[in-house]
Amino acid sequence: MSKILCVLYDDPVTGYPKSYPRDAIPNIKTYPGGQTLPSPKAIDFKPGQLLGSVSGELGLRKFLESRGHTLVVTSSKDGPNSRLDKELPDTDIVISQPFWPAYLTEERLAKAPKLKLAITAGIGSDHVDLQAAIKHGVTVAEVSYSNSISVSEHVVMMILSLVRNYIPSYQWVVKGGWNIADCVERSYDLEGMNVGTVAAGRIGLAVLRRLKPFDVKLHYIDRHRLSLDIEKELNLTFHPNVESMVKVCDVVTINCPLHPETEHMFDDALIAKMKRGAYIVNTARGKICDRDAITRALESGQLAGYAGDVWFPQPAPQDHPWRTMPYHGMTPHVSGTSLSAQARYAAGTREILECWFEDRPIREEYLIVDGGHLAGAGAHSYSKGNATSGWEEATKYKNGTS
């Protein structure tokens, strides 16, 4: 029997919900492009419940314990005295999330001789040192596409919020004001702007499709060029490199994976090549942007706004400069963990576990590392290497509600 260690974010400060605003969520049959949704043999939760927090347990406890496995669920993941570090040495399977990542570094993997499977409940497995996973024979899998549409919707929301200056306008209402000039002095129409995406995979392409009705000019870069049919359908302009694209764009949205080649891609030099007053929306990974370069660009006016829900490390310490920099629209990492998305990535996590325990192949699109090599989605989107350095700063986080 196996020991499964599941690292999830904390419950709401008001306690685990006893009821929800909606009685049901839409039943999505397929993903765009024909990929099927997660297909476990059964689930032990009602879609629309809070599954991604500690008490939600991804709906896995009944399934695992009825088969004799041990499930340990915790939010304690950072520092040498964390529950993660205490439980890891005799753990067979680790489940984590991008939103509250259990950083599986070389040091941690070396202390976990029994660990054979690391599952990301969601998409994006950069919290795992993939080179170390290959070295130690750990299979890495994630629930591809489970929250791609969720994230793409969040991107469009953030673009509109920045360009239309929504957050300051909302704050005037909360403060009891009616300061229209203050609201509109930084407000523009999105119509007619040039909008580009760094990567046009599942999320990036979904963003492009959702932006087309806004009558914008769409641009993209990707190491796998889209088909001519899609380029014609969306009237896309393909660029051979990121420098070419950012020079012409008013809005840039980042939708690529984090790996050594994309780490700190948006630094002082690249931002200086952008239009003055451009906007960046980053729901990919915080480390793709140089933290201090973003802050400097907002303070100087080179950027008109920056929004996103990804930070490095996560959770972000209270003194992280992105919390207080001007003209930002940051949120905690929530774009891919709506209640709708949770139902899908919880089901996908169970599907992966069922395959693992029954010695059936995990579907190819879920695999990142397998058999000592990058595999499946990992071979398509990642590169070997480590993007976890600096994770220790997450130990500085103190819950602002305590």
Q: Which residues are covered by each model-predicted region?
A:
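Rossmann-like dinucleotide/phosphate-binding beta-alpha-beta segment
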Residues: 166, 181-276, 384-402
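Rossmann-like dinucleotide-binding domain for NAD(H)/NADP(H)
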Residues: 277-402
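Short glycine-/small-residue-rich Rossmann-like dinucleotide-binding loops
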Residues: 98-99, 123, 250, 256-258, ...
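Phosphate-binding beta-alpha-beta segment of Rossmann-like dinucleotide-binding domains, i.e.
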Residues: 136-138, 143-194, 206-209, 213, ...
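Residue-level detector of alpha-helix initiation sites
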Residues: 124-127, 142, 146, 202
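An N-terminal-biased, well-structured beta-alpha scaffold segment characteristic
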Residues: 2-139, 267, 392, 396-402
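Alpha-helix C-terminal capping/helix-to-coil transition sites in glycosyltransferase folds
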Residues: 89-90, 111-114, 247-248, 273-276, ...
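Conserved beta-strand positions in the Rossmann-like core of class I SAM-dependent methyltransferases
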Residues: 72, 219, 287
